């Protein structure tokens, strides 16, 4: 209560909300006042305009007023109220002309308040930065009304790239584009204690802030996996094949009205191959319950990283037995569904390519037609090796199709080589 007004202004945050058109006119709370408070004095001009408006109205003949004046004059005379000659003039106190009546217009005299939402917010952010009175700015839904390329411009204007910022900016967002444009040390995750934590430590009722220090791997994770920062839990998948498998199984569960990982707030992040361990640690350090879903074809090389992740509380789900994801698929697939897998490979690579891949990995002993029409158990490792080395399914779309339309509907027929880790994951 005892703070001087100038000190209150320094503490009071400026808010850039979804509607901010009032800042494009000289209203009482407009940012334009902060740009012009020492130079703009239009009181005399507005008073003169009020008098001119009153005089101009008096010179106009307003239809219907004369009859009303005659009736009022008659009634006042009958009652003995002395009013003299009646006139209908503008009451100077009824003409509301203030600084708020002055607004910005463009070259064709269109008020700038009619700009689109995104354009007006972008302009106002620049005005607020120029005014620089408030050291705190609150931005609600930074992406609202803006194309992605203009989001970058807005964040730059707010100081996202400045090494020595002069203002503190609090941003709420639901856009991965916004996160990708931030520096890693600008991202902070605020969490409230869980019911279990409160039960064991009632005094720990405050929120906890998790932050990043801006390291290279953190910045890379923020840009590569921005969508995952909006979820409740994260599955860091080694690559796109694993992402596709999880998504495909999840879609099949959705098709059958079963619980899905998406409904539980879980998102699959791209681990980027061997970077998956470092990326998982980034999410875990921010308080996200984190798991890694990987294949096992590099188990010896990953052993140290795997143990470190487990000790950090990160769950590990993998096929085991040094199997790649393609191994797990072909080893566990029932024979009658092998052609369906090959059909998906044909869509991506073509029959001729599959023929050469299979012959190259079988010492030219078998070809595509042998596997497609006369499949035997001994062909499984050849198909798995061909699929792995020649990337038959190494993308989200083919792996998702396999999981949704082949594995999911025939789940009970697949062996535990595939089902075991998936059961644990789901």
Which functions belong to the PLM regions below?
Residues 20-23, 143, 175-178, 194-195, ...:
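Conserved nucleotide-binding/hydrolysis micro-motifs of P-loop NTPases
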Residues 14, 137-139, 235:
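Hydrophobic positions in the central parallel beta-sheet of the AAA+
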Residues 98-227, 304, 423-426:
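Switch/communication elements of ASCE P-loop NTPase nucleotide-binding domains
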Residues 9-13, 133-134, 183-186, 263-264, ...:
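Short glycine-/polar-rich loops that comprise or flank the Walker A/P-loop
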Residues 31-123, 127-136, 160:
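Extended helical coiled-coil dimerization/tether regions that scaffold
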Residues 223-236, 240-426:
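Acidic, Mg2+-coordinating catalytic modules of nucleic-acid enzymes
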Residues 1-48:
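Glycine-rich phosphate-binding loops of NTPases
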């Amino acid at each position: 209560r005892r703070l001087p007004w100038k000190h209150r202004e320094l503490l009071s945050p400026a808010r850039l909300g979804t509607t901010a058109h009032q800042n494009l006119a000289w209203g009482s709370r407009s940012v334009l006042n902060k740009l012009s408070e020492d130079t703009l004095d239009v009181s005399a001009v507005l008073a003169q305009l009020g008098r001119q408006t009153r005089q101009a109205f008096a010179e106009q003949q307003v239809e219907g007023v004369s009859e009303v004046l005659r009736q009022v004059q008659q009634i006042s005379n009958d009652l003995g109220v002395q009013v003299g000659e009646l006139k209908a003039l503008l009451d100077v106190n009824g003409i509301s002309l203030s600084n708020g009546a002055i607004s910005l217009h463009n070259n064709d005299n269109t008020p700038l308040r009619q700009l689109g939402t995104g354009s007006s917010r972008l302009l106002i952010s620049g005005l607020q930065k120029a005014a620089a009175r408030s050291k705190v700015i609150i931005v609600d839904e930074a992406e609202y009304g803006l194309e992605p390329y203009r989001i970058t411009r807005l964040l730059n204007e707010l100081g996202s790239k400045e090494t020595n910022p002069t203002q503190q900016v609090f941003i709420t967002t639901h856009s991965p584009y916004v996160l990708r444009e931030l520096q890693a040390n600008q991202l902070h995750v605020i969490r409230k204690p869980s019911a279990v934590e409160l039960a064991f430590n009632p005094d720990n009722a405050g929120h906890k802030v998790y932050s990043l220090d801006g390291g290279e791997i953190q910045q890379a994770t923020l840009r590569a996996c921005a969508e995952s920062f909006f979820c409740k839990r994260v599955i860091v998948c080694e690559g796109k094949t694993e992402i596709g498998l999880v998504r495909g199984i999840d879609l099949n569960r959705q098709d059958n009205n079963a619980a899905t990982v998406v409904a539980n707030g879980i998102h699959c992040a791209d681990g980027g191959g061997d970077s998956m361990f470092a990326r998982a640690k980034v999410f875990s350090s921010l308080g996200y319950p984190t798991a890694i879903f990987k294949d096992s074809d590099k188990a010896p090389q990953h052993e140290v990283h795997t143990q470190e992740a487990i000790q950090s509380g990160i769950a590990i789900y993998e096929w085991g037995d040094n199997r790649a994801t393609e191994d797990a698929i072909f080893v566990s697939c029932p024979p009658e569904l092998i052609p369906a897998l090959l059909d998906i490979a044909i869509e991506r690579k073509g029959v001729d390519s599959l023929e050469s891949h299979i012959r190259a990995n079988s010492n030219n002993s078998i070809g595509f037609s042998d596997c497609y029409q006369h499949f035997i158990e001994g062909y499984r490792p050849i198909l798995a090796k061909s699929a792995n080395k020649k990337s038959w399914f190494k993308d989200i779309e083919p792996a998702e199709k396999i999981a949704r339309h082949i594995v999911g509907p025939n789940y009970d027929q697949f062996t535990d080589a595939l089902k075991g880790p998936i059961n644990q994951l789901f």
